[in-house]
Every structure is written in C-alpha cells, then in structure tokens.
C-alpha cells in the first residue's frame, strides 16, 4: 500500500487502537491479542493502530514490539490495515519504523518524542528523519511535547512525501484551524484527543470528520453507532450517548492520571476479552471503579 492509498483510507471512517494483551506475569499474550483482533476487525474500523499509546507502546521491549506488530499484521492481513506506533529517541523511532515496515505494517503513527523539552524545530527534524527512513505512510501525532505549527508542517509536507496524516491530541482549536486551512487536502486529519467522541462533532465542523476511538476496544457496536450518528449529523443520538455513557465514563477516567489506558483495559475485561493488567507506571482501576464501569457498559446493551 503506497502512502497516498493509506491517506485515502484514513480520510474516512472510524479508527481505533487495540490494547496490548499481557498475561498475569505481565508478558505479551499473543493468543489473547489474536483473539482480540479477530473480535474487533469485523466491526468496520477503517484501520487499527497496533502498539499505539493505548497499546502501551512505551512499555514494550523491542522484541515484544516486533511480536505485537507481526501478530497484528498477520491476523488482520485480509480484514483491516494495520498502522504501527513508533516513538522514543530519533534513532529508536527509526529502528521501530523500519522494523514495522519490514513486518508489513501499512503505515506508522509517530508518537511524541522522548524529550521533556525541545524546540519545535528540533521536533520537526525528528519527524523528518523518521519519515525519510521508510517508504510507508506516516501520521504525526501532535500531542504533549510535539506541538508542530502550520509553518513547520508545511515544510515537512514539502520534504517528506510520505508524511500523509496529522493527528491532533492538543485540542488547540486555533492551531487546528490554521493547520487545516494551510495544508488543505495535503494530509488526512484525525481527531486524537482522549475519548475523542466528546469532541467529534466540534472537530467535524472544523473539517476533521475522522477520529480514533478508545471505547471501540470494549463497546465496538456503540462506538460505530456513535460514529455513524456523527457522520449523519444525528444530534439527538449523539447527545443521548454523550449523556448516557461518555460523560459518566469521563468521570471515572479522570480520577487518576493514566486512566485513559487503564479504563480501556478494564472495559475489555468486562466485555469478556481480558487483556491483563497495565504495566507500571500505569495503575489499574480500583474494584469500585471497575464496578462503576461495568454498570455503565451494561446500559449500552449487547455488542
């Protein structure tokens, strides 16, 4: 799949990022991961991101990363395109990127770099180096320390033909508008704030109708129903699902830092697809929070 074909795929539909399965000892559980992918693939997501942020990329050893990406690519070869998360230092990100390309990933999601502080010129150089190390398409994730503006993204677009996507995890509307207006159809644009459904209608109004869904991991039917309601401007259905599920869900998620991942793994367990514990420094939900989420999911009915 060439980068432009990937860009076309990412410009439509719902995206998601499977959690990574670990066993009780905290090791990668390949059988569980295969079962998860086989469950999720038929629901209709346009693409899946393996070893992304919710897939705990930053907790994976290099050998585990290869296992996760190969398992995802092999399992979903005939059903849904797999993009691989990559990140870390520039040299590490390049190694991961080249490994993902070798294993058959259709594209890459370039996660924020490892530094706590860096100039955006330096961030742009990091992105350029990773893009130029591979031939497959790359989506850059503006989040946390990565805050590329329209000027830098325009330069990167000129230098890196395979940089085909921009995922926004900042929620800076002024920045999003400036990027969308400046770059036009050069990129596919993805909403990437945690629990993106809450912001989906607003982002669609900005010209960003595509987003990645965390809750697709455990209520895939509801996630697709919500996406279709957004697509057809069914404000009544959107509002009801936000009131009945997403706002109470946020109340649980916001209790502790890192719960954006932990709550998804808890949801997967409740749904019957236990992915095991999160790895430190993340922490799992408490028993009380787990029961609160279970009650909330029960209201959404069979998936």
Swiss-Prot record:
MF annotations from Gene Ontology: 4-hydroxy-tetrahydrodipicolinate synthase activity; 5-dehydro-4-deoxyglucarate dehydratase activity
InterPro entries: Aldolase_TIM (IPR013785), DapA-like (IPR002220), Dehydro-deoxyglucarate_dehyd (IPR017655)
Enzyme Commission designation: 4.2.1.41
Keywords noted in UniProt: Lyase
Pathway of action: Carbohydrate acid metabolism; D-glucarate degradation; 2,5-dioxopentanoate from D-glucarate: step 2/2
A Gene Ontology BP annotation from the UniProt entry: D-glucarate catabolic process
EC class name: lyase
Catalytic reaction(s) noted: 5-dehydro-4-deoxy-D-glucarate + H(+) = 2,5-dioxopentanoate + CO2 + H2O
Pfam short name (any one): DHDPS
UniProt entry tagged with the keyword GTP-binding: no
NCBIfam families referenced in this protein's UniProt entry, alphabetically: KdgD, PRK03620.1
HAMAP family to which the protein is assigned, alphabetical: KDGDH
Protein family membership: Belongs to the DapA family.
Protein name: Probable 5-dehydro-4-deoxyglucarate dehydratase
């Amino acid at each position: 799949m060439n980068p432009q074909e990937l860009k076309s795929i990412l410009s439509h539909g719902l995206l998601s990022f499977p959690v990574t399965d670990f066993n009780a000892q905290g090791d990668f559980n390949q059988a569980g991961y295969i079962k998860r992918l086989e469950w999720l693939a038929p629901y209709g997501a346009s693409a899946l991101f393996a070893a992304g942020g919710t897939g705990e990329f930053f907790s994976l050893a290099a050998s585990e990363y290869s296992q996760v990406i190969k398992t995802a690519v092999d399992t979903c070869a005939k059903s849904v395109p797999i993009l691989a998360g990559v990140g870390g230092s520039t040299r590490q990100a390049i190694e991961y990127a080249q490994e993902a390309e070798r294993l058959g990933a259709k594209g890459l999601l370039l996660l924020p770099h490892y530094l706590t502080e860096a100039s955006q010129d330096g961030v742009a150089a990091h992105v350029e180096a990773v893009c130029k190390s591979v031939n497959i398409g790359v989506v850059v994730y503006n989040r946390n320390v990565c805050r590329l503006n329209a000027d830098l993204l325009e330069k990167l677009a000129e230098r890196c033909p395979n940089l085909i996507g921009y995922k926004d995890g900042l929620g800076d509307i002024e920045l999003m508008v400036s990027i969308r207006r400046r770059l036009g159809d050069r990129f596919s644009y993805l909403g990437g704030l945690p629990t993106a459904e809450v912001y989906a209608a607003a982002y669609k109004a900005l010209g960003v109708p595509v987003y990645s869904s965390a809750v697709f991991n455990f209520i895939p039917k509801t996630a697709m129903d919500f996406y279709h309601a957004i697509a057809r401007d069914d404000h009544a259905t959107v509002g009801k699902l936000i009131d009945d599920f997403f706002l109470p869900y946020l109340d649980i998620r916001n209790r502790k830092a890192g719960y954006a991942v932990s709550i998804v793994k808890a949801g997967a367990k409740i749904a019957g697809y236990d992915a095991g514990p999160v790895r430190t420094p993340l922490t799992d939900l408490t028993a009380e929070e787990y029961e609160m989420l279970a009650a909330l999911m029960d209201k959404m009915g069979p998936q």
